[in-house]
Amino acid sequence: MISLRQHAVSLAAVFLALAMGVVLGSGFFSDTLLSSLRSEKRDLYTQIDRLTDQRDALREKLSAADNFDIQVGSRIVHDALVGKSVVIFRTPDAHDDDIAAVSKIVGQAGGAVTATVSLTQEFVEANSAEKLRSVVNSSILPAGSQLSTKLVDQGSQAGDLLGIALLSNADPAAPTVEQAQRDTVLAALRETGFITYQPRDRIGTANATVVVTGGALSTDAGNQGVSVARFAAALAPRGSGTLLAGRDGSANRPAAVAVTRADADMAAEISTVDDIDAEPGRITVILALHDLINGGHVGHYGTGHGAMSVTVSQ
């Protein structure tokens, strides 16, 4: 008969064996697990290094492509606007770099910028519709001129008025706007808070216009995109060509470029470019203006939704 002591010793031996098994087993599995994790970690680091190298290589290629565009851009646009002039309108979200780049490339194309006129936040938000309408319909309209009766919203009417004042009408029968009348229109809109510009001795008329806007607009931007699109479209009949240019994201609603492309009437009036923040887009601005001034068709260019091609076909 097994004594109590022997029974206790047997149980102790069993528990000891179990404990040793657990310890040895856990050590084995933990070593295996750690070894596997170390291997996976090395593989991940290898993948990260490879992806980093690929990213750096792509960045170098993009940089080289941008530098190439910058170097050859002036040759591509050479004499495209020789003897022609352009007035630039900018929205509150337009970038200074884009304005400077457009002004520069107009000069490289042989053209001249007559003025850069800024539309204020009050203008694009359209919260002062009656105030703007009263200014537009006041006695500042140049003698012999008439606003289009088809345009009823204040943004379009303001575009029509500024088109009369600042653009050379392609119709030789159109009345000539004197400098004093032009100054009156600009001063009235500036004093009422709708535009700003750097006063010069003389802001002459231009053959064409570029309206420069920003990129994507937030969904709570209200009617800003619509206001800018209608303004740009209203300028078109008064000169030899109007182009609306925006940055990456401008081809998405509710931005002005997207609004223009989605509206058949506006899309038939003005050209658009949706990548003015890149050198190819700036080159396209000049090529598109050249087409418009010389009687070509409107076009919609860039890489965003609604673009018909990346640039103007030759």
Curated annotation (Swiss-Prot):
Protein localization: Cell outer membrane
Keywords, alphabetical: Cell outer membrane, Copper, Ion transport, Membrane, Porin, Signal, Transmembrane, Transport
InterPro entries per UniProt: MctB (IPR021522)
GO BP terms, alphabetized: copper ion homeostasis; monoatomic ion transport
Any one GO cellular component localisation term in the record: cell outer membrane
Any one GO molecular function term: porin activity
Signal sequence coordinates: 1-30
Predominant place of localization: membrane
Phenotype upon gene inactivation: Mutants show a severe growth defect in the presence of copper. Deletion causes a drastic virulence defect in guinea pigs, mostly due to a much lower bacterial burden in the lungs.
Highest taxon listed in the record's lineage: Bacteria
Family of the protein in this entry: Belongs to the MctB (TC 1.B.50) family.
Described function: Pore-forming protein, which is involved in efflux of copper across the outer membrane. Essential for copper resistance and maintenance of a low intracellular copper concentration. Required for virulence.
Listed name of the protein: Copper transporter MctB
Species whose genome carries this gene: Mycobacterium tuberculosis (strain ATCC 25618 / H37Rv)
